[in-house]
């Protein structure tokens, strides 16, 4: 009887482990973006936050010489990036990320305000999961 019980438990555990591993693998995706003055940045993806940030910096440098220093990143593929650029006290851009447009905009406004920037304007939104502008 105990051997039969062990076999049943093993038979039930294997599919659960496979299901759990599949879910974890699906969540190992990070999106990152480094904004620039030309608004020509693209969203990039990687399996780690650090790798995504590094790739975003490289992608920005391929198309611009005005890349921001700090990438924005998220592992929420349903999140949104908001990109703003400011002109006072000097030209600078930043990106914020949030669960929706208003949260992302709130985040980037906070970052720029805390850094002392003013005369800022929203450049664009990007969908984290697809990279689509809008």
Annotate each PLM feature:
Residues 24-134:
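Secreted/extracellular ectodomain signature
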Residues 1-11:
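Bacterial N-terminal signal peptides that target proteins for export
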Residues 11-14, 77:
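Low-complexity, intrinsically disordered short peptide segments enriched in small/polar/basic residues
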């Amino acid at each position: 009887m105990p051997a039969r019980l062990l076999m049943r438990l093993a038979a039930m555990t294997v599919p659960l482990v496979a299901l759990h591993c599949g879910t974890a693998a699906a969540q190992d995706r990070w999106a990152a973006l480094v904004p620039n003055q030309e608004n020509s940045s693209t969203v990039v993806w990687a399996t780690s936050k650090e790798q995504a940030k590094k790739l975003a910096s490289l992608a920005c440098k391929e198309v611009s010489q005005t890349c921001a220093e700090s990438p924005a990143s998220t592992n929420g593929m349903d999140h949104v990036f908001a990109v703003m650029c400011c002109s006072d006290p000097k030209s600078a851009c930043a990106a914020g990320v949030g669960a929706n447009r208003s949260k992302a905009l709130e985040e980037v406004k906070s970052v720029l305000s805390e850094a002392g920037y003013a005369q800022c304007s929203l450049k664009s939104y990007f969908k984290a999961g697809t990279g689509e502008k809008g």
